[in-house]
Amino acid sequence: MDRSMVKGPLYKQFDLERKSARQAEARLSLRLQRLEIICLYHVKSLAREQRQLQKELQRLQQDIIKKRFSSYVGHEIQKRSKDVVTFLPPTGQRHAVPEPKIRTLKNSVTQEVKTKIPVPSLHDPVLKDTLRSQEHLLSHGERTSCFKEGSPQGQEGEPTNPLKGVDPSKDVSVPCHDQELSTNKTEDSGVSSQDGERGSAPANETRSENASQKPRGDADVQNSPSSVDYAGSFKDERTKPSFLELFEKAKNAHYVRHRVPPESERLLSIGEIFGHKHYSLPRTGETL
């Protein structure tokens, strides 16, 4: 009896201890889970903060690089500006580099050239001869140009009536306005040159004697190959037939006809018209 009485309360005590141990384990497991959740949250927050810190670090590094680059560029610009701008040591005032005085140099050079090069006198006979030869060549060139321009205009228009008082067998060239002006200019220049020669003859006797000893320049101008070729081409153009000659020849030309009239222009008889082969016209005085 005593043993059974003793075993009963012991078993109850063991059961209570087991229950309490199980409850403690459950509480510990719950706390453990909570701690794990808290640990994960802290780890995630730390990772987020680490990313933010890395971004800020990159931004700061870029700002530092930009500042260094801007400071370097500003330093280089200052160096270049110092090289360009000079400073006066006593006063410290800035002054720009003096530019070259181009205009003054040009004026001085032109004045020196004018003083060194002698201007030829207008009464020099050599100069007068050269001017005459040049005017002669210019007048010839204007005549040939007018002749060339007048020929195609005549071919396009083809005038049927020739000009009054003009021989068609001779060469005809219509004068241009420029040609008339050039001829008037040459005449005026010839008159003025003659007057100048008469007035300056006693003053330029010594010059003419010196010029007679030296070779004259107008001979070179007149005998130059360009003037000879130009005169040759002008002669060749003058030998060509004019437009009026060709027009007269074409107007007087007749078309050559065949001696025998063609079959299309032959007169047919009545028998050939009505299909009778052996049919002849009745003679005078006969009846059909």
Curated annotation (Swiss-Prot):
Biased composition (Basic and acidic residues): 177-188
Residue ranges that the Swiss-Prot or TrEMBL entry lists as coiled coil: 16-69
Pfam family, one: CC190
Keyword RNA-binding: no
Residue stretches of biased makeup (Polar residues): 203-213
Organism superkingdom: Eukaryota
Residue ranges, annotated region (Disordered): 141-235
The keyword Coiled coil is annotated on this UniProt entry: yes
Keywords: Coiled coil
Protein's name in the database: Coiled-coil domain-containing protein 190
Organism placement in taxonomy: Eukaryota, Metazoa, Chordata, Craniata, Vertebrata
